[in-house]
Regions:
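Cytosolic, long alpha-helical scaffolding segments
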Residues: 199-200, 206, 213, 269-285, ...
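Charged, surface-exposed helical/loop "interaction arms" that form contiguous linear patches used
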Residues: 153, 157, 167-170, 223-224, ...
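Extended, charged coiled-coil "arm/hinge" scaffolds of SMC/Rad50-like chromosome-maintenance ATPases
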Residues: 208, 291, 295-329
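Conserved NTPase motor "head" modules and their coupling/switch loops across ABC/AAA+ ATPases, GTPases
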Residues: 272, 280, 284, 342-401, ...
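Single conserved hydrophobic/aromatic residue that forms the stacking wall/gate
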Residues: 1-9, 14, 398-408
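Charged catalytic and DNA/RNA-contacting regions of genome-maintenance
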Residues: 10-123, 139-152, 156-245, 373
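Extended active-site and interfacial segments that coordinate phosphate-rich ligands
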Residues: 279-306, 390-395
Length: 408
């Protein structure tokens, strides 16, 4: 127990994780972390917290009941269409879709928490215009949970960072729109959303808008972000111009009218002077090769240009990769903020989705009690109603209580 407790404690505070009262839970968490260490061979920075599961919070549904109720897939075809999830899922993000599925598979049984969710959905239906604006801002958001996992495992490519930037650029307007709501759950979501404007600015300043997938091909870093990148990039694209300017300058300076800058793979770049102009060659020209009718020279300035031009591409690719990794690492350092925000966005997406479904289908808000009575008047099966055409669905009347058990 102490060994596993030490392992969990090294990753996250046991007290903060809620495991301080769960000896068996600490052992299980420690065993899982050890397994991940041994199999992933990598940092577990994406695991920022452990949340204990309480059987008193959620309804326990066995696998047979889950299948027969067709909560997330149909019994025969094993497809989403025709299931309860199919009716309820109007989410805009992958995170929201996963969270809604978890809601359906693990229904709450705590009356207070159920009513908090009802309050959030009710508020969203009372502010239809704001709700639709929220949907528009949710739609472009990529899967932040998966993106930050790739970032922390150092497998994210430049396009992942652009997707991350485009996603978090939606956060400020979403956070602002949530000012219109007063309910506890929506306020908690607003507080948990971190706009992360400095990370958005970092990626916007550094990474090309349409970068390659590979991090080893160059073309990753924007102009103006790093002076050396700009210098190497200019050397790569403007090398011929620089050489032509140097050639013209040396002709004028020396008076050698037929002086030319040439290149071969053996000697690199050189200044070629015919024998008829040998007497005009200045002292700072260093002889590199002698031919039958000409001499080849190098100057410090030409050597500097040669090093810059020939090494520019390799240096550029290497430097861009290093800068990209630096940006990626800065994002990875904010994993806790990003995960908290991703969870908040996922929950918001779910509540907006449920509000849309309730509005479109004219669902009413049930009154929750602890009396043990289920009393439904004008009940409609959400799935059957959708599958039957021409308004043929017949409303149901159901009363279930302890003495009578069931009456329809």
């Amino acid at each position: 127990y102490e060994m596993q407790r030490s392992l969990v404690g090294s990753e996250m505070c046991i007290r903060d994780s809620g495991l301080s009262d769960y000896a068996c839970g600490t052992i299980a968490a420690g065993a899982l972390l050890r397994y991940l260490y041994e199999t992933q061979k990598n940092d577990l920075g994406n695991l920022s917290a452990i949340h204990p599961y309480s059987t008193g919070k959620y309804m326990i549904i066995d696998s047979s009941t889950r299948r027969n109720l067709e909560l997330v897939e149909t019994l025969r075809e094993k497809q989403k269409r025709g299931s309860l999830l199919w009716v309820l899922d109007k989410t805009k993000t992958a995170m929201g879709a996963r969270t809604l599925r978890a809601y359906v598979e693990q229904p709450l049984i705590d009356k207070t928490e159920i009513e908090l969710r009802q309050e959030a959905i009710g508020e969203l239906n009372d502010h239809v215009i704001t709700r639709e604006e929220l949907r528009e801002y949710l739609n472009p958001i990529y899967d932040l949970e998966r993106l930050i996992t790739r970032v922390t495992y150092r497998t994210a490519n430049p396009r992942d960072l652009i997707a991350f930037k485009n996603s978090i650029s939606m956060l400020p307007p979403i956070k602002s729109l949530l000012d219109e709501f007063d309910g506890a759950l929506l306020k908690n979501i607003q507080n948990d959303i971190d706009a992360m404007e400095e990370l958005c600015s970092l990626v916007d300043r550094s990474i090309m808008e349409e970068p390659p997938i590979s991090v080893r091909e160059g073309g990753l870093i924007k102009e103006g972000y790093n002076e050396d990148v700009d210098k190497y990039r200019n050397a790569k694209t403007e090398g011929k111009t620089w050489l032509a300017e140097l050639e013209a300058k040396e002709r004028e300076k020396t008076g050698i009218k037929n002086l030319k800058i040439k290149y071969n793979k053996v000697f690199g770049y050189y200044l070629e002077v015919t024998n008829s102009y040998k007497d005009l060659v200045p002292d700072y020209f260093t002889r590199k090769q002698t031919l039958a009718n000409a001499e080849r020279y190098i100057t410090p300035e030409l050597k500097e240009l040669e090093d810059m031009i020939l090494g520019a591409e390799d240096k550029l690719v290497s430097l861009e990769y290093d800068l990209f990794c630096e940006v990626r690492n800065k994002i990875a350092e904010e994993v806790v903020r990003i995960q908290r925000t991703a969870k908040a966005i996922a929950n918001l997406d779910v509540f907006v989705s449920l509000a849309v479904v309730a509005d479109q289908n004219n669902y009413c808000r049930p009154k929750m009690t602890n009396s043990g009575v289920i009393d439904i008047k004008g009940g409609r099966h959400p799935v059957v109603e959708k599958m039957i055409t021409n308004d043929m669905f017949i409303l149901s009347l159901i009363h279930i209580s302890e003495p009578t058990r069931l009456r329809c």
